[in-house]
Each structure stands twice: as structure tokens, then as C-alpha cells.
Amino acid sequence: MAFSKSLVFVLLAALLISSAVAQSPAPAPSNVGGRRISPAPSPKKMTAPAPAPEVSPSPSPAAALTPESSASPPSPPLADSPTADSPALSPSAISDSPTEAPGPAQGGAVSNKFASFGSVAVMLTAAVLVI
């Protein structure tokens, strides 16, 4: 009976420790050595130009324009036009470099500390119940 209680306690402790380790954040990648991958690959040169698709010289009667179809409706305002409420950013103002990118949130590290304290509390409670 004592062997089964201690086996349950060891299994419970291993489960809680592995749970806390699985929730821990991964270490930050090191910037030492290695090859940096460029964000946009260079375009490859084509040896022969692609043949242009053939276009028929005379339009079909079904595609002929009528006065109703030739009149264009008024165009809606552009969605990306700058307004007074939303200032537009120029492409040079947007940063692509990873050194200026935001880091990972620190909320996960705080919750992992609480998870480890909770694991210790549950293990102590299980130890008291086993004894």
C-alpha cells in the first residue's frame, strides 16, 4: 500500500514538473554566427521572353459596347486615401529590420512563475495527503 502511494506521488510530481517545463518560454535565438536569410530573394533572369497571347483582331458581336454599358458608374472613394483622422505612413517610415521589431510579451513568463508555485503547492498537498 505504501509503495502504491509513493508511486502515485512520484507520478504526480513528474506530471506537474513536466507541465511547468512545457509552459516555459523558449530561449531567445543567439545572433552569433550563421547565415542571414534575406527577406526577398533576388529575381532570376529569364533566358527567353514568354510568348504573347494571341488576340483576335475583330471583337465578337456579344462583346460589342452599347450606350448603356459604355457609361461608367461614379467611382467610390478610395479606401486607402489619407484622411484627417488617419495619417498615412510613407514606406520609408515602416521598419523591416528585426532589431527594431517588438520583442515577445512578458506576460507568459509571469504566468509561468505562478504555474511553478502552483505545482509546488499541489505537490506539497499531495505529500501531506500521502503521509
Swiss-Prot record:
Tissue specificity note: Predominantly expressed in flowers and at a lower level in roots and leaves.
Membrane-topology descriptor: Lipid-anchor; GPI-anchor
S-adenosyl-L-methionine found in the keyword field: no
Residue ranges listed under propeptide: 109-131
Cellular component per GO, a single term: side of membrane
Protein task: Proteoglycan that seems to be implicated in diverse developmental roles such as differentiation, cell-cell recognition, embryogenesis and programmed cell death.
Family: Belongs to the classical AGP family.
Descriptive protein name: Classical arabinogalactan protein 1
Organism for this UniProt entry: Arabidopsis thaliana
